[in-house]
């Protein structure tokens, strides 16, 4: 089992499970990021406990924070190797999980597992992966892949085909990607963005960003999911990731995003994004002057967080 840890709870059941796995004779490799702000002391203490239990510990990289949420379980039965890969948008932390909204994908697809294995092999050598086919992995294989996906939508728009980009992040400050989004808007791509915090793009500017909408949802739970959607309809390319679209995430950190191949999961994410776009209680819509406006009271109010909460409890 291999895992990256950024922020963990003070009494972490995740770390206890890793310790138990190592004590049961499993081969456990844990990358602990010691520079997680305000959690340095906690992470040092857990590293010591993990090492004592027989886990192999890697202490991040010299010049890059490892912010990814990646776990890989490798099983060898005879000569056959199988993988279970988990990629998430949120930390392995029970305390923050109570109040943050996040997505987590678990997949047995071998191509994802093999690529995740390459990511860990590079990290174990103090390096970063330079090429990926499936996963989005910064600092080398996230920004450029995202730019290619934006270009693909621009080509569709220019050919008169439906073109769409949807994005949900905590912050948008990466100038290169902002410029790509502006170019896509000018090419006729419809773009919807849910950006909770800092957003350095102003939507609704004629001839620049008139095809872009930006809204921020601030509710009872901290919006923390990162979703990238490229394409209109069910054939859209959908990713979940640990990375915001900030230069610190795309260039100065190790982040991982995963494609969603399962049609049911993809449909669920698309549906949830549409619901968030319809939120008229906690969503504030960015105006062309950069201000955010709450929507006027509706006869049918929709609070997306409450809606998802009710759905989860009805399941």
What does each of the following model-derived ranges do?
Residues 8-16, 168:
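Active-site-adjacent structural elements in folded domains
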Residues 92-125, 269:
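Mobile "lid/hinge" segments at catalytic clefts and subdomain interfaces of large enzymes
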Residues 13-20, 177-181:
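A short acidic, amphipathic alpha-helical/loop segment
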Residues 126-135, 160-162:
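Gly-rich Lys/Arg/Thr-decorated short loops/hinges at beta-loop-alpha junctions or inter-strand turns
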Residues 24-84, 88-91, 96, 111-113, ...:
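PLD/PLD-like phosphodiesterase catalytic module centered on the HKD motif
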Residues 17-20, 119-123, 150-154, 242:
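Short hydrophobic/aromatic-rich motifs at helix boundaries and adjacent loops
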């Amino acid at each position: 089992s291999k895992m990256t840890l950024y922020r963990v709870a003070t009494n972490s059941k995740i770390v206890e499970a890793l310790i138990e796995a190592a004590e049961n004779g499993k081969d456990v490799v844990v990358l602990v990021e010691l520079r997680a702000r305000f959690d340095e002391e906690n992470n040092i203490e857990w590293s010591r406990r993990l090492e004592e239990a027989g886990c192999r510990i890697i202490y991040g990289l010299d010049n890059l924070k490892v912010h990814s949420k990646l776990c890989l379980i490798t099983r060898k039965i005879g000569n056959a190797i199988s993988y279970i890969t988990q990629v998430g948008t949120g930390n392995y932390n029970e305390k923050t999980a109570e109040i943050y909204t996040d997505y987590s994908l678990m997949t047995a697809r071998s191509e994802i597992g093999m690529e995740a294995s390459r990511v860990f092999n590079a990290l174990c050598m103090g390096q970063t992966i330079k090429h990926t086919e499936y996963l989005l992995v910064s600092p080398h294989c996230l920004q450029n892949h995202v730019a290619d996906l934006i270009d693909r939508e621009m080509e569709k728009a220019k050919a008169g085909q439906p073109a769409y980009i949807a994005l949900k992040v905590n912050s948008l400050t990466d100038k290169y990607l902002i410029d790509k989004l502006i170019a896509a808007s000018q090419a006729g791509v419809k773009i919807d963005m849910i950006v909770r915090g800092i957003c350095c793009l102003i939507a609704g500017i004629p001839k620049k960003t008139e095809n872009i909408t930006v809204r921020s949802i601030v509710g009872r739970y901290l919006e923390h999911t990162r979703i990238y959607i490229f394409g209109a309809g069910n054939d859209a390319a959908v990713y979940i990731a640990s990375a915001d679209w900030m230069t610190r995430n795309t260039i100065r950190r190790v982040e991982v995003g995963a494609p969603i191949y399962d049609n049911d999961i993809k449909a669920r994410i698309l549906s949830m994004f549409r619901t968030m776009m319809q939120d008229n209680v906690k969503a504030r819509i960015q105006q062309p002057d950069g201000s955010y406006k709450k929507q006027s009271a509706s006869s049918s109010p929709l609070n997306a967080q409450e809606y998802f909460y009710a759905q989860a409890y009805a399941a």
